[in-house]
Every structure is written in C-alpha cells, then in structure tokens.
Amino acid sequence: MRLSHLFVASTAYLHGVLATTQLPLADETLMINGVTFETRARWMRLANQALGELSGSPCPFAAFGTVIVNHTASDEGELICMGVNENGKTGNPSSHGEIAAITNCTNILTDPNGKFRLTATEVAAAFTDLSLYTNAESCPMCASAIRWAGFREYIYGTSIARLIEKGWGQIRIPSVDIFEASFDLPYPSRLMANVLANETDPYFLWQYDPSYPCPLGCSRTKSGKSCKAGSS
C-alpha cells in the first residue's frame, strides 16, 4: 500500500469512516491458525474478567483488559499473564492494559524462581509464539508495542471507531494502519478485529452515557454519572 493510501485511510478515519483503501480483515468467526471462534471468545471474556481480578472492580472507568496466551502449546491455549489499564493507580500515562500485560509477562517469563526461567534473549523469541487479546482496539502506542514484540496474533474486541462514537478521546490511527506500516519488522503478526465485540462494547458504553446500564455486578452512583461495584 502506497504512503498516499495510508494517508487517505487515516484521513477518512478522522471523520469516523473506515476507508475503503484499507485492507479487509478476516471474519472474526473463522478458525484462524487452528483456533476456533469459541476458544477465542473464551479468552476475550477472560480479558473482560481481568478487570475485576486486577483492578478490584468489574466496572473501572478505564475498562481496558488484556490477556496474553500461548496457542502453540495447545489450540485451547495456555494463559501466560494478564494486565489492565493502570493509569489511575500508578499515574503513569503509558500504563495501558496491553503495556501492563507485556510487562507482567516479561516478569513472569524471566522470574528465576518461576515456571519458565527464560533469559532476556529467550523472552524476545517467546513473544513470537504468543497471542495478545485485548477487549478494545489498541491505541497507536500499544499497537506499536505489539508489533515490536512480534506477537504471533493480536485480537481485539471493541474498535477505536466505536470508542470515539461513544465519547472516548482517542488518537485516530487504527491498528491496521500500524500493522501496514510495520512490514520492515522481522516477525509478522496476525490481526483479528471485533472478536466478541457484542460483549466487550458494554464495558465502554456507560462512561459518557448516563442512560446506559452499568456492567454486570455494578450500579449507578447516586449522581448517575458513574458506575460502582455492587447494587445501588
């Protein structure tokens, strides 16, 4: 794809329209790399569940959850690590769910007393066997980190376009543009979009719409402006 086409794609995205010059993506319900949609749905649901496990609430405002899985061990996959957006916890603006998960995986894989005990060189190679599931499309920073790591697969639920439509401030560069521009990197990554978006979307639709129901296990605060764990 020529640079002019990349520019047209990005410009069209600014107006909330996916450009026709972008390459088509595979149907998310297909069996890709020997992994069924049912299996992918299970891992995407775990990315949602990571919110409650790691953030302490099933309805954090920044409800971005990630799991990293090894499908080369078995088609069903082996969980390596999880991560959630930690901006509010750490104050670090780069602590997005994907970055937190990659950091957690690196620590787990190199832990000298852990299961894997890999060297730094071995970890770099290990990422090429792993799949990253995130319940919302990665920002350009995280999509770039995914490509630098060389993940075998990158799977997301809710799209950036959907987030923007529902009030979220986003850098309007879709992951497919990052992937198209990263062909010089040594390891290819397969991108799968909109997996289980019908279940990931509700985690991002209540923050700017007081009339939208809170996620399961949460209820509106008295002001109606936010959601909290438990019943009202």
Residue ranges of model-derived segments:
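Residues at secondary-structure transition points
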Residues: E38, K89-H96
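Short, glycine-anchored, charge-dense loop/turn motifs used at functional sites
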Residues: H71-I80
